């Protein structure tokens, strides 16, 4: 029987201490096992900012899977990769596995204001 892995993104409204910055993610991304999932994070000129991605499974704390746009922490599989350009940052998960089912959050670090959103 075929099954589908559901990768959920959330609509994020992030507020800094001085200005507001809105990040938009799709409500959900659904792919078949073995295929490639791409989860986007949209924001005005997001390519000029540093983007981090977190994976959160039910009942667990978030886990950092990509930082500074495209770097992976130790222990995160190479199947997880990131890119960031223009108004869109993207988390790509290659060869999706059942264990990848989770919520995925993007976080932006604006170096000009020196605090996260």
UniProtKB/Swiss-Prot annotation:
Might you name a Gene Ontology BP term for this protein?
immune response
| Signal sequence, start to end | 1-17
The UniProt GO MF terms for this protein read: antigen binding
Region of interest (Complementarity-determining-1), residue spans:
42-50
The segment annotated Framework-2 runs over 51-67
- For this chain, the annotated S-S bridges are 41-106
| Top-level lineage group | Eukaryota
Mind telling me which InterPro entries this protein's record contains?
Answer: Ig-like_dom, Ig-like_dom_sf, Ig-like_fold, Ig_sub, Ig_V-set, IgV_Light_Chain
Where's it found, cell-wise? Secreted; Cell membrane
Region (Complementarity-determining-2) spans which residues? 68-70
Give UniProt keywords alphabetically. Answer: Adaptive immunity, Cell membrane, Disulfide bond, Immunity, Immunoglobulin, Immunoglobulin domain, Membrane, Secreted, Signal
Keyword Nucleus on this protein? no
- The record places domain Ig-like at 18-117
Region annotation Framework-1: where it falls in the sequence: 20-41
Keyword check for Disulfide bond, yes or no: yes
Alphabetized Pfam families for the sequence: V-set
Q: Where is this region: Framework-3?
A: 71-106
Q: Where is this region: Complementarity-determining-3?
A: 107-117
Q: Which GO terms describe its cellular component?
A: blood microparticle; extracellular exosome; extracellular region; immunoglobulin complex; plasma membrane
What does the record give as the function of this protein? Answer: V region of the variable domain of immunoglobulin light chains that participates in the antigen recognition. Immunoglobulins, also known as antibodies, are membrane-bound or secreted glycoproteins produced by B lymphocytes. In the recognition phase of humoral immunity, the membrane-bound immunoglobulins serve as receptors which, upon binding of a specific antigen, trigger the clonal expansion and differentiation of B lymphocytes into immunoglobulins-secreting plasma cells.
Subunit structure comment from the entry? Immunoglobulins are composed of two identical heavy chains and two identical light chains; disulfide-linked.
Indicate what this protein is called per its UniProt record. Answer: Immunoglobulin lambda variable 3-21
């Amino acid at each position: 029987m075929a099954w589908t892995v559901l990768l959920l993104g959330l609509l994020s409204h992030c507020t800094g201490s001085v200005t507001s910055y809105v990040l938009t993610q799709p409500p959900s991304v659904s792919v078949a096992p073995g295929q490639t999932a791409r989860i986007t994070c949209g924001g005005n000129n997001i390519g000029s900012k540093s983007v981090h991605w977190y994976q959160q499974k039910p009942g667990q704390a978030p886990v950092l899977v990509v930082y500074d746009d495209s770097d992976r922490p130790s222990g995160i599989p190479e199947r997880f990769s990131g890119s960031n350009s223009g108004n869109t940052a993207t988390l790509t998960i290659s060869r999706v596995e059942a264990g990848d089912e989770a919520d995925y959050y993007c976080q932006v670090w604006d170096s000009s204001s020196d605090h996260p959103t």
